[in-house]
Swiss-Prot record:
EC class (word): transferase
Main subcellular localisation: cytoplasm
Biological role: Catalyzes the transfer of the gamma-phosphate of ATP to D-galactose to form alpha-D-galactose-1-phosphate (Gal-1-P).
Any one of the GO BP annotations: galactose metabolic process
Pfam families membership: GalKase_gal_bdg, GHMP_kinases_C, GHMP_kinases_N
Positions bound to ATP: S78
A GO CC term attached to the entry: cytosol
Organism listed in the record: Treponema pallidum (strain Nichols)
An example molecular function term from Gene Ontology annotations: metal ion binding
Protein name per the record: Putative galactokinase
Keyword Protein biosynthesis in annotation: no
Tree of life domain: Bacteria
């Protein structure tokens, strides 16, 4: 029943964005891309060491409608934000004040670097993905833009090429890391499955998720995230530097999942950094354990991996905060002593705010939402909860 209502809601959103596009520009869309949001269940910090990431596409989507222009101008209209931008292929440099439009510019530049000839486009964007919650809105927009450009200006554009184009946009023009797990997840996802990103092989693999009798809840802590990017980036950089020191030893394995904590005793780094790198080593092993548990349909084993991961992120990697820990603790209060470890919860993303996810039994969903009323009384602002499902990946209509 929930799937039916979600499908109906998606159809209504598409009708709305198509109608607004025609009203804004006077022409009908020639291509429409629908891209899901995503959240990471485990391993989102392991890309630099060629580890694995386990992610899930969700049924909250970004829709992009486009129609061709006869000039080189790109007109962008965000229905979600009520904002308009006008850019030209002659001037696509990054400008801080352009904010979300920089994602579009980066993908256009990446296409041009690939030798594609582009004309201008009229673009209308409607995003249902909660903003500023770490659920992949910027990369959803980039993937959507790459898909519609491919539909209109490339004879064929396989998904692997879309991955390369968006990664190039991120690394060269937005000066971030590739965000490979984000891109592969939303491109290759299937309803009812998680996506494992193998950063070493640059591949995605589906892993069925047993959702019967369960509810998946994302809870946005609404903690102001102005410190999250800077603090998380600095912390991860120190871990990358420590890992690079380990790799200088020719006897050390290349993949983090094969790196033993004992190897870190041989390098000269502060104890805090050593502790965080060891937590990432354990996280990498945990991803493999979680996937094996899902394949065996052993949700109790999967839940144990998830709950221990949050403990490591809180105590060893130190990227949690009181608000996130409170949300996780409320979810875990529904663990049944007679059937332990069938409820799990963890922060997802950069930490220092953002979201938690919880996988609850059907009967625990409404009581969990009721407990969120206490959150505002304790912290002074409301949390926002979203029930989600494993979604299909991106598509072009």
């Amino acid at each position: 029943m929930l799937y039916y209502f979600n499908t109906l809601a998606m159809m209504l959103r598409m009708q709305r964005v198509e109608s607004c596009h025609t009203e804004e520009y006077g022409d009908e869309p020639e291509a429409i891309a629908v891209v899901p949001g995503r959240f990471h269940l485990l391993g989102e910090y392991l890309w630099f060491a060629q580890g694995n990431t386990l992610s899930m596409a969700i049924d909250q989507t970004l829709t992009l409608c486009v129609s061709r222009r006869k000039d080189s101008t790109f007109r962008l209209f965000s229905l979600t934000l009520g904002e308009r931008r006008k850019i030209s292929t002659a001037n696509l440099r990054y400008r801080k004040e352009d904010r979300w439009a920089n994602s579009v510019k980066a993908v256009i530049l990446s296409f041009m670097d690939g030798g594609y000839h582009l004309t201008g486009l009229n673009c209308t964007i409607l995003s249902q993905i909660p903003p500023d919650a770490g659920l992949g809105t910027p990369n959803a927009l980039k993937v959507a833009m790459a898909l519609v450009l491919g539909r209109l200006f490339a004879a064929t554009l396989p998904k692997e090429s879309v991955v390369s184009i968006v990664e190039h946009a991120n690394e060269r023009y937005l000066k971030t890391h590739a965000h490979r797990a984000d891109i592969l997840c939303v491109l290759f996802a299937k309803q009812g499955s998680c996506v494992r990103t193998d950063h070493r092989k640059k591949q995605a693999e589906l892993c069925q998720f047993p959702s019967e009798g369960k509810r998946i809840v994302l809870t946005d802590s609404r903690v102001p995230r102005f410190i999250a990017r800077e603090e998380f980036t600095a912390r991860l950089k120190r871990c990358v530097d420590a890992y690079e020191l380990v790799k200088r030893n020719p006897d050390m394995p290349r993949a983090m999942s094969k790196l033993m904590a004992a190897a870190l005793e041989e390098i000269d780094v502060p104890e805090g950094i050593r502790r965080r790198v060891i937590s990432l080593v354990r996280e990498s092993l945990g991803v493999d354990e979680a996937i094996e548990a899902l394949r065996k349909r052993d949700f109790a084993a999967f839940s144990r991996v998830v709950n221990r991961s949050h403990e490591r992120l809180r105590d060893r990697f130190e990227i949690s905060c009181p608000e996130l820990d409170w949300l996780v603790k409320r979810a875990l209060e529904f663990v049944d002593p007679d059937a332990p470890d069938v409820v799990c919860s963890r922060l997802t993303g950069r930490g220092f705010g953002g979201c938690t996810y919880a996988i609850l039994r059907d009967q625990d969903f409404e009581p969990y939402l009721e407990r969120l009323d206490e959150y505002e009384r304790i912290f002074g602002f409301k949390a926002a909860a979203y029930e989600v499902q494993c979604s299909e990946g991106a598509r072009v209509l």
